[in-house]
Amino acid sequence: MSGLGGLNKSPNGVVMGMVQLQLPVTKTPADLAAQTARICDLVAKARRNMPGMDLVVFPEYALHGLSMDTNPDIMCRMDGPEVAAFTRACVQNKIWVCFSIMEFNPHGNPYNSGIIIDDQGALKLYYRKLHPWVPVEPWEPGDLGIPVCDGPNGSKIALIICHDGMFPEMARECAYKGAEIMIRTAGYTAPIRHSWKISNQANAFSNLMVTASVCMCGSDGTFDSMGEGMVVDFDGTLMVDGSHRPDEIITCEVRPDLVREARRVWGVENNIYQFGHRGYVAVKGGARDCPYTYMQDMVAGKYVLPWEKDVAVTDGTSCGFPVPTRGYQPQPVITEKRKYA
């Protein structure tokens, strides 16, 4: 039940608006400034559209479009004018918003980043995409882990970006750290439609967690993004889904309190608990070991597939990018919760 898209808001509900933003073309700093202003205008539209809305979500690539341009002149900085404008929009409209930016990285390729700013102008969540959509995307692999923040009306929220959601471990990490709502922003195009839907539903069901997901929408003359906003309840049931109409705002009320209840009282299919307590009917507390070889190997830095040497695509040359010469070096980052008047 979505409360008629949030029109009938319950005391424990969180009303979300998923913006199927028209795919932009951003080539210059002037284009970036214009798109920033457009997004801020849509924040105001969302507030006017539904006074009870708590959180608005913009898709991946909302500022930069799908060109994969790494030109530093159009990259964002956390202390730059784009984030400052977004913060003012949140304060002026008294609403929480999830934004997408391509973030300047002085040590390598830009990061594909997402931020959540609250209605008081505080930065609540700052995430860098862990799994760029290789070999198509040139972004630096994220180095901030998967943060979870306190959200509106007592909720717990995590953010992942696009291709991240194809890895079940990403959703499991969000839930393990307490997320009741997992936002997934994306720029996907039509060939991914089926995978998008089944992964959003599986991520919800497997973790007793609401998933709220949205793509860019429309055409930029080269690419066609699919829209396909969707909110899935914690049992895997589709609550609302969008069309292919650019700038449509899909709304839904979700209930974090019912997520918490299910995690406490469910027996059958309480998978997030049972994963670490195997066979608790037979043995007290269940088996608490880690029988998964790939997990042990990854921690040891020895993750190698049986067919590893036969994998054909291991860099971005097929998509026009040069062979990388740097190894992965995570950079120390200071994230500071700030408020803007």
Show the residue positions of the predicted features.
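Active-site-proximal beta-strand/loop segments in catalytic clefts of secreted hydrolases
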Residues: 19-21, 60-61, 100-102, 161-163, ...
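CN hydrolase (nitrilase-like) catalytic-core segments centered on the catalytic cysteine
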Residues: 81-98, 156, 166-253
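Short beta->alpha transition motifs characteristic of CBS
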Residues: 64, 71, 115, 126-133, ...
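N-terminal active-site segment of His-dependent metallophosphoesterases
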Residues: 1-54, 183
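Short, glycine-anchored, charge-dense loop/turn motifs used at functional sites
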Residues: 16, 112, 116-124, 230-244
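C-terminal beta-strand edge segments of enzyme domains
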Residues: 3, 148, 210, 216-341
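Cys-nucleophile CN-hydrolase/nitrilase-fold catalytic domain and related Cys-dependent amidase chemistry
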Residues: 30-119, 124-126, 189-207
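Active-site catalytic loop in hydrolytic enzyme cores
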Residues: 88, 105-180, 185-202, 225, ...
